[in-house]
Structures are given as structure tokens and as C-alpha cells.
Amino acid sequence: MIIDGHSYCLPQMDSKVGYPTLEHKMKLLQSELGGHIQPVWNVTDRKKADNSTLIDQHTGDLRDVEWTRVNGGLAWKIDGQTYTKQYVPPMLHNLECPPEVLIREMDYAEVDVGLLHTYPMIGTPKFLNDYLNKAVQKFPKRLYRLISITEGDLIRDVDKVIEMIDEQRRLGGVAGLQFIPGFYYQTLDDSSPDTWDSASLRPFWDAIYKMNLPVYFTLIGGRGSKIYERSWMDSYLAEQKVLLGWLNRYPGLNVVVTHGLPWTGYLENGQINFPEEIWDIFKSPNCHLQILIPIQMGARWEYPWKESEPIIKKAIERIGANRIIWGTDMPMVARFCTYKQALDQFRVHCDFLSDAERKDIIGGTAARVMGITN
């Protein structure tokens, strides 16, 4: 069985998706696009531009833009010019990836199962949980989903969040909870010493532990850090230390670190060199790692991403293939490669892998974590 451990169904990008107004949603999208590495260009002459057309590079403030579509793609107008970037791949002509599109891609690439992830930009938890539930109910045993929450709600009404999660998991097709610590910190005062593993959240995590619900942690750095600067890397390691303490408190509960490790942050002279402490969380036998090389390194390396093989080999040595999960970020990975190519990195290449290791990485590990037995 081949399982894509990290994929998406996407509602239309320029729709409200549960937010109070479309303007509210588009500001979230502007913030996301304005910090993203995908290139910007002027739609008139295709000359390169940059993210300063979205975000003031000195203050971090959002620019006053007018959103539009050009040739079916998202674009924005500012200072009399129209700009775009290919955040979603061109094939998503209506800025959406409904489950039918994902299933067709899976069928063609010979992927049996996809695990649908969440993110605030895709929709509010109420909207997104309903949207993804409909997808997995339409394609049972082909699609599974993670539960979306607003991490800040844990400060305001933890019991309500627990109740919602319990209701969602009873609907079926749920493989776990996605938790993004960085969004929890956004609701705290900068002077607060609390973390998402502080005593105030113990009732929440105790409830998740009692449910035996796997947790998919998306570590995006801590407070006030800028991605891939030294402050971000330091805060990433600090976040791992919080997770290590959490793992020790809740032994036996399956955990997955999504997106892999910060490959780009530790890229030096074409090689990824991690500090020793980055492996500490995997001392817990229940801590698993997703690996999504093409979506993260596709702007730098070409298929079959041979440059990544030394760090993949090291990850297998330090963690074990039985705790590594292949994922793609589909449909987003189509910015850089086909679905088959993303799979063939492990199905065909990485010659150092044994047959058993290949099977674990491209499906066996995910199946065990997700509780799939057939």
C-alpha cells in the first residue's frame, strides 16, 4: 500500500472559507504569499518583481492591493501594475483542488491513500473540518483527514475545543489532530513564559491522550523569529525541546513531525548539516518524521534530488525507516515535479534503501500510525 502522508484538498483560494469577510481571508492570504519564496512577476511583461508588492519589507505591513484573477490565476494590482506568483500550481485553474482532482492524481501515480492536512489560510476550523469530512466520506479508505483547531481557542475555552475534537473524530475518517505551536504563541503576550506544554494546557493534552489521537505537530518556529534566520533556527530547536518534554509526559501516543526538518535553514555549501540536538526528539519511539523533499527543495534541486540522499540516509540511521513517512504536499508539489516523480524519489531512487525500508517509507509507517490494517 502506498500512502501519501501529506496532501491537501483545497477550496477556492479567493473565497471566504468561513472567515467573517472575504477581506479578512485575503489579508491572511496576502501575509502568506508575501513571505513565500515563489517568484513574483509583472503579468504585462513577465518581468521579475518581488514580495515588496505585497508586504512592506521594512515595516512588515501589508500593502494596499486589489485582488483579481489573470488567466485563472490569482493576481494583485498595486501602483497601476498587476503582479502574480504561482503559489498553487497552474493546473488548479479555478484556484481549488476538490477531492475528485486529488483522487485522479492519486490514481495516475498509483497512490492508494492520501492524508489531508490543514492550515488556517485554507479555512477556519469549522469550515475546513466540514469540507474535509465531506471529502473523506465521499472517498472512504482513499482519503483520511486531520482535525483543524484554532490553537488560540485553548486559552479561551479549552473544554469547547476538546468537545469539538471528540465530535470530529467520531465522524470517521480521522487520522489525527494537527497542532501548530506557532499559532498558539500568537495569542500570548510576548512576556509570557508559557508554552503549549504548560500546566494550563494539561487538561487538553490529557484529553487527547485519553482519546489516543495521534498528533501531527507543525513546528514553524517560536515568537518573533524570522524564518530561516538564526533566531528562527534557535526557536525551532527550542520548540523541539518543548516537544521532547511533551513526549516524555505522554508516552505511547503516536506523534508525527510534519514537513520534515528545516532542510533550508541548515543548508551550507549544498549540504544539509544539522546540529546533533535536532535528533533528540526521536529518542521517543513514538515520534515519527515526514519527509517532503520536492516541495521544500524543488526550487534549488532537480529531480531526483540526489543532493538530499545523504541527509535521508542519515535520518534512516538515526530514526529508522519504520518511523519515516513519505509525503508530498500535493497539489502544491506540482510547482516542481509530477506526483509520480515525488513518489519515485523513494520508490525508484535512493539506492541505499532496502525493499523493506522502501515499503515502510512510502506506506507502511503511515499505515501503522493511522491504524490502517488493509
Residue ranges of model-derived segments:
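Mid-to-C-terminal alpha-helical segments outside catalytic/metal-binding sites
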Residues: 1-5, 12-93, 97-104, 108, ...
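Catalytic pocket-lining loop regions of alpha/beta-barrel enzymes
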Residues: 140, 175-176, 183-185, 190-325
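Active-site metal-binding loops of divalent metal-dependent hydrolases
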Residues: 7-8, 120, 260, 329-330
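Active-site mouth loops of central-metabolism enzymes
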Residues: 85-96, 146-158
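Short, acidic/polar
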Residues: 96-106, 129, 155-168, 274
